[in-house]
Amino acid sequence: MKKKYWLFFLFVGWILCSCNSNEKKLNEVLAKAVSCAELGTVEYTITKLIMTDDDAFYKFGDRKIIFSCRTTMKAGIDLKDFVMDDVKVTDGGKTVVVNLPYPKILSFNMAAEDIKLEYSKVSGLRTSFNTDERNDLLKQGERAILEDAHNLGIYDDAKKNATDFFKALLTQCGYENVNVCFKGDESKN
């Protein structure tokens, strides 16, 4: 994983150093950036408690279980949806407007070693949680984290970091004004 990051940063450094003439290099720079396919701009590590209290009025006893899990979620720009028509140069080559795809979750990892059973209580005539019930509970927790991603601010951070990246990249290529917009910006809705 670190090797990918080093290669990416070497690639970006090479691009930044090789930018001389605006128009000619813009197409080269953006084509090389798009060839990366995904631009991961932010990574969150989230710890969540997943719990259930299985109260069945017709059964005697309690069933409770609590898991803690640590997940890693990366967000950024999927450059497969980016085309050169999304770049407009105006003001005689001084200003460039880049219209990027809206950020999305690029990877989500809830590794088995990061899931811990914190508490389990079974009393009365109840049976323990079986493997399928535990897996279903963990899947519900995963869905809850993904559904709450917007409230966590990961998309806002991904937009900010992508904006900073493209502004720095295109400023190094000689553009005085760089404006970065996002297609389908959900914050406008």
Listing of model-derived features with the role each one plays in the protein:
Residues 1-17:
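Sec-dependent bacterial lipoprotein signal peptides
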Residues 19-189:
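Domain-level marker for long, solvent-exposed, non-transmembrane regions
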